[in-house]
Amino acid sequence: MKNFLKIALTLAAVVACTASFAARDNKRQLRGSGNIVSKVIELTSNDYSNLLAMTGVEVIMDESGGKMVKIDADDNVIDYVICEEVNDLLTITVRKPDCTSYSNLNVKVTLPKNENLTRIECRSAASLYVKPTFASGDKLFIRVNSSARVMVNRIEREDVGIDASSSAKVQGSFKCSRLAAKASSSANINASVLAKKVSIWATSSGEVELNGATTQITAEATSSGRVLCSRLSAQNGVAMATSSGKITLDCYDFLNTKATSSGDIISTNSAAKTAIAEVSSGGSVKLNCSGSLNAKATSGGDIHYTGGCSLANSQTSSGGSIKKF
């Protein structure tokens, strides 16, 4: 009988502890109910220059003016939606005290137009869609990571910077003097560009794909990164591909390429008047040239060229090859 009582008391204690832990875990979790409700709040001002979106929220900036913000969210989540303006930063997120897990959230925040933005940042699967055209201002920097997404209609600024990482995505149209874009860790940047100078980096399976026109492009791809710019017409181009990185270009005046360690560069749409190609360690360059070509291939590197160019300088060694196709 005593043993039976001990076992019963032990089981009761285990059940009580399990229930206690379950209750505590439920408090630390927030799961959207699917029942969407709405409310409208008013911003302190609408002249912030930095916007940060986090925790899976969907933010839409529309053409409306004023300071009113509409929030559509699950009825058990809407009270935890934060739209907080501190100094020059507007933060939009979901924040429940002591909560460590958020799932199945349905949160849409609609903002009025604000052309004062100089910095946009999205994290943790948040998304931002900017509908208005921004036709004034000097700079705009966009940073996205952790599966977040930014889509812009049209941005016109002197300088535009984009940094995407960890499966994040950026899409849009940009008119600027200078564009710098970097994609890493399976992130993707896809944009239409009209710029004087474009600088691109792609690494760790990141991808940058651009179309449009530029005076000068500088591109670097490494560690299986991809720069796809065959639909971006460029007067001058400099490209370097290493460690299985891939670059496609379209340069019609001057082209300078270097490919090593199985890097791959292709520029065959337009014929560059002057071209330089250097390959080594299994690197590959394929180009179109109508004027003079300086080519150097070593250690199993391959250069293939077409067009009416003449070889001003040609060097091969250690299994490197230079061939016309």
What is each stretch, according to the model?
Residues 1-325:
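Intrinsically disordered, low-complexity terminal regions
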